[in-house]
Curated annotation (Swiss-Prot):
Domain of life of the native organism: Bacteria
Lineage: Bacteria, Pseudomonadati, Thermodesulfobacteriota, Desulfuromonadia, Geobacterales
Gene name tied to this protein: argS
Subcellular location(s) of the protein: Cytoplasm
Organism the protein comes from: Geobacter metallireducens (strain ATCC 53774 / DSM 7210 / GS-15)
GO terms of molecular function: arginine-tRNA ligase activity; ATP binding
Subunit structure: Monomer.
Main location: cytoplasm
NCBIfam families reported for this sequence: argS (TIGR00456)
Name of the featured protein: Arginine--tRNA ligase
Disulfide bond annotation, renumbered to this chain: none
Keywords from the named record: Aminoacyl-tRNA synthetase, ATP-binding, Cytoplasm, Ligase, Nucleotide-binding, Protein biosynthesis
Enzyme class label: ligase
């Protein structure tokens, strides 16, 4: 509807140019917004203010000129146009025009809300990317929900999306993992003086050790690893432990309905020589220096607050060097747009990774890649914070939440706040089967509509299709509000996708569910006469479709019974 209003304004301005009423002959950007107050109409346009300088006229005079040239016609969508204040053009849409939105929803079905805004442009989204050193924690879970939903939103907006998981399967943390598993294999427990200083203490380490000693075989992605069973073969333990925990993380993500197109391994950057090649190019480009036996990168040349060590005096690389190599590989794979969804604790790495990429002189834009950073999650039960999982040892796992409150509630709750806002996950609320639980509130609206359809069927009343639905009878404030909300769904999707803000979908669905509950509490659907019942059933058919489509974008089910 907003696009149709924009087109009417543009056509009116073209007529002004054609007859000389406006002199600039340059079409301005036409912004159509929802007014802050309902009494000002359905849409407002500020184009007259933006044209004032070029036209050398008062905005209100320009607005009056444009309005005179807008041709709506008897069958048009505009029910009224007002000019307010210094030159706001306010539009009121005819009820019958709003009602026709329902026919669009019916025709599009599961595709309603999707657009071609992305024009099939390639976008790579990297998310989760957990170290394979233990079960996924709740921070990974929030990142998985946000990243996965961003992918769904971008796909719905016409982008060609590649989902990628980067395994940090090299470095000090993996060495600590291997030592921890080896210690368990040898019967050494935490607290023993022989236990590794930075060892992992969760019960899952015992599980890995037991499987290793039993010479089990693990399949993880393209890896097929059979345990050697030798507690003294640290390299064999490392390979098995990484594969074992990769498999566990993959199973957790599958339970969370999160899937990836590409899995990349940090270790492959070393075996393929990519890390050494990046270091060679950085040295060759003159952006490095040696000091105290270490190799440094002059990241201050590219906006960092201090220079950074690349290669330590012992010959090992700091973690951001393989990150630079990995992102160069992304660029070389043709991804001119990359979005990294990460925890806020990775904020400090952004500047140095971008600095390394700039120092390569590879033609990579300064602000590439883009980042979405999520804040921490606090889990509450009975008014107290939950901090420990027996299996993980020191943190609450994603699997803990899924097992306790279910996938739907876990995903919805993770998505209810803007990524850069801290999130309190109330387990008690997530388990409630009441309208106080946000995900239950939305799902119940869908289930309630299904029960209405079932009741209609029991009375021999079928849910109609357009044009037999008598939508012209839909005129109560609650009915029109529902239709307006339904009509705004495509815009909500596109806005959420382009801003990387999935929480907008949760807000929208709660608003739509609330509008439905308000409508249902004030209006009878069945028993108000055949034609009005038909119209209201058709309205609810549209509401149910949009609720289902919106929940699908969040990876949440739309049950028909609850």
């Amino acid at each position: 509807m907003k696009d149709r209003v924009r087109s009417l304004v543009a056509e009116g301005i073209e007529r002004c140019f054609a007859d000389g009423s406006l002199a600039s002959n340059q079409m301005p950007a036409i912004v159509i917004e929802k007014p802050a107050h309902a009494e000002h109409g359905d849409f407002a346009c500020t184009v007259a203010m933006s044209m004032a300088k070029a036209e050398r006229k008062a905005p209100r005079v320009i607005a009056e000129t444009i309005v005179k040239h807008i041709e709506n016609g008897e069958s048009g969508i505009i029910g009224g146009i007002d000019i307010a204040g210094p030159g706001f053009i306010n539009f009121r849409i005819k009820n019958e025009a709003w009602s026709r939105t329902l026919a669009v929803v019916e025709a599009a079905g599961a595709s309603f809300g999707r657009s071609c805004a992305g024009e099939e442009r390639k976008v790579q989204v990297e998310f989760v990317s957990a170290n394979p050193t233990g079960p996924l924690h709740i921070g990974h879970g929030r990142g998985a929900a946000i990243g996965d939903t961003i992918c769904r939103l971008l796909s719905a907006s016409g982008f060609d999306v590649t989902r990628e998981f980067y395994y940090n399967d090299a470095g000090a943390q993996i060495a600590n993992l291997a030592l921890s598993v080896q210690s368990r294999c040898l019967g050494i427990e935490p607290g023993d003086p022989r236990w590794p200083a930075d060892g992992y203490q969760g019960d899952y380490i015992k599980d890995v050790a037991r499987s290793y000693l039993n010479r089990e075989t693990v399949d993880a992605g393209d890896q097929h690893v059979t345990a050697a069973g030798d507690p003294n073969d640290l390299d064999a333990i490392r390979r098995f432990a990484v594969a074992y925990l990769r498999r566990e993380q993959d199973q957790d993500l599958l339970a969370f309905d999160v899937h990836f197109d590409v899995y990349s391994l940090e270790s492959s950057l070393y075996t393929e020589g990519r890390v050494e090649e990046v270091v060679r190019r950085l040295i060759e480009n003159g952006h490095t220096f040696e000091q105290d036996g270490a190799l440094w990168l002059r990241t201050t040349d590219f906006g960092d607050d201090k220079d950074r060590v690349m290669r330590k005096s012992d010959g090992s690389y700091t973690y951001f060097v393989p990150d630079v190599a990995y992102h160069l590989a992304k660029w070389e794979r043709g991804f001119t747009r990359v979005i990294n969804e990460q925890g806020a604790d990775h904020h400090s790495t952004i500047t140095r990774v971008r600095a390394g990429l700039q120092a390569l002189n590879a033609g990579i834009p300064q602000e590439w890649p883009e980042y979405v950073l999520h804040q921490m999650v606090t889990v509450m039960r009975g008014g107290e914070e939950v901090k420990i999982s027996k299996r993980a040892g020191s943190y609450v796992t994603l699997r803990d939440l899924i097992d306790e409150v279910g996938r739907d509630a876990t995903r919805f709750f993770f998505l209810m706040r803007k990524p850069d806002s801290q999130l309190v996950f109330d387990i008690d609320l997530a388990k409630q089967q009441s309208l106080e639980n946000p995900v239950y509130y939305v799902q119940y609206a869908h289930a309630r509509i299904s029960s209405i359809f079932e009741a209609a069927c029991d009375r021999g009343i079928s849910v109609p299709s357009f044009p037999d639905a008598h939508v012209d009878l839909l005129e109560t404030p609650e009915e029109i509000e529902l239709i307006k909300l339904i009509g705004s769904f495509p815009e909500v999707i596109e806005g959420s996708a382009l801003s990387f803000e999935p929480h907008r979908i949760t807000y929208y669905l709660q608003e739509l569910a609330g509008a439905f509950h308000s409508f249902y509490n004030k209006n009878r659907v069945i028993g108000e006469g055949k034609e009005l019942s038909s119209a209201r059933l058709f309205l609810l058919k549209g509401v149910a479709q949009v609720l289902k489509n919106g929940l699908a974008l969040l990876g949440v089910s739309a049950p028909e019974k609850m």
